[in-house]
């Protein structure tokens, strides 16, 4: 069984990876994107107004072996305010995936 500190570290690593990828992809300043502190309420990735204009999503990150996707999607939606909620998730030795509603996906096309 994984300890609480190991579980939080796993989640923190995913959040930091997502933060770094957003910074790189959108050529943002490091102060524009930060990973939430474990246990902090709201979105897992905190964005400045400048970052939000380039990346208009509210991010929930989950690094879990057995993910309850419905609870996780609800959490993403509850924390999204007026932004498009996305759930970024992975488990050990897997790719990282993103999920969002069909309507939000089609709006991107």
Please describe what each predicted stretch is.
Residues 1-109:
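Catalytic phosphate/metal-binding cores of nucleic-acid and nucleotide-processing enzymes, i.e., regions
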């Amino acid at each position: 069984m994984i300890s609480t500190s190991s579980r939080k570290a796993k989640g923190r690593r995913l959040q930091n990876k997502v933060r770094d990828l957003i910074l790189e992809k959108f050529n943002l300043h490091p102060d524009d994107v930060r990973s939430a502190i474990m246990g902090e309420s709201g979105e897992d990735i905190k964005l400045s107004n400048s970052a939000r204009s380039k990346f208009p999503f509210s991010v929930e990150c989950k690094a879990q072996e057995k993910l309850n996707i419905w609870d996780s999607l609800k959490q993403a939606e509850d924390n999204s305010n007026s932004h498009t909620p996305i759930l970024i998730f992975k488990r050990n030795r897997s790719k990282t995936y993103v999920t969002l509603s069909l309507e939000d996906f089609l709006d991107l096309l």
